């Protein structure tokens, strides 16, 4: 027989969005923001410890607006950028009214914009006085974050803990104070802890430097 599809919701009206911006200045600032993201990548590559980040270049850097929407990115790993904004918005949602200058957050939760657990995201707000203007964020593939097997994320996992350490909304830097001991505790205090927390910490330091 025939399958008949009947629309029950009105088709959304699509209107072209105009702009009064100077196209020259728009392009200038577009390239300025992209250049910042590229410089973030150079810093991350040059200061990271792991081969994954330093040589394989398995990372991405980007700039987001105060609401977590993507403004500009460098041509790193496009697969990271599709969901990184959700990670920024998760940080905003979970810390509403509590984010301050000098703070940075870490997460790899796939339920909040993460990809697989080895991809760890560091999110840092950019303030002017008391107002958040932007967020800068970078995501890097750490060689190991625990799990049943070295390298993390084994395909036969039946539960998220078997893939590695799940990090959600952890404040890595609190008003300029780097919380290394607490971060090590997160990496080690798990059913399947990270096998080389020292390397994880070194790469997280590089991500902070990039931001």
Provide a role label for each language-model segment.
Residues 64-65, 123-127, 139:
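Core beta-strand residues in small-molecule sensory/regulatory alpha/beta domains
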Residues 9, 76, 138-139:
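Residue-level structural signal for beta-strand termini and adjacent loop
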Residues 12-16, 113-119, 145-146:
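Short, Lys/Arg- and Gly-enriched loop/turn segments at beta-strand edges
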Residues 31-34, 38-45, 99-122, 126, ...:
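Cysteine/selenocysteine-centered motifs that mediate thiol-based redox chemistry or coordinate metal-sulfur cofactors
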Residues 129-211:
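Mobile "lid/hinge" segments at catalytic clefts and subdomain interfaces of large enzymes
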Residues 1-18:
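Terminal amphipathic helices with adjacent charged low-complexity linkers/tails
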Residues 13-24, 69-72, 192-195:
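Gly-rich Lys/Arg/Thr-decorated short loops/hinges at beta-loop-alpha junctions or inter-strand turns
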Residues 28-50, 57-117, 131-135, 199-201, ...:
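Alpha/propeptide regions of enzymes that mature by internal proteolysis
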């Amino acid at each position: 027989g025939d399958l008949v599809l009947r629309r029950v919701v009105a088709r959304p009206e699509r209107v072209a969005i105009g702009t009064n911006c100077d196209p020259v200045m728009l392009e200038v600032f577009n390239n300025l923001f992209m250049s910042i993201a590229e410089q973030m990548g150079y810093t991350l590559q040059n200061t990271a410890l792991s081969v994954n980040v330093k040589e394989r270049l398995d990372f991405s850097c980007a700039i987001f607006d105060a609401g977590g929407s993507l403004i500009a990115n460098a041509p790193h790993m496009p697969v990271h950028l599709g969901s990184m904004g959700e990670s920024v918005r998760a940080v905003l949602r979970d810390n509403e009214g509590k984010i301050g200058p000098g703070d940075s957050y870490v997460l790899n939760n796939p339920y909040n914009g993460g990809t697989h657990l080895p991809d760890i995201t560091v999110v840092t707000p950019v303030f002017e006085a008391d107002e958040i203007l932007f967020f800068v964020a970078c995501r890097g593939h750490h060689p190991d974050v625990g799990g049943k097997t070295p390298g993390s994320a084994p395909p036969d996992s039946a539960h998220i803990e078997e893939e590695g350490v799940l990090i959600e909304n952890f404040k890595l830097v609190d008003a300029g104070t780097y919380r290394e001991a607490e971060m090590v505790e997160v990496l080690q205090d798990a059913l399947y802890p990270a096998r080389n927390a020292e390397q994880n910490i070194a790469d997280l330091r590089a991500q902070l430097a990039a931001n």
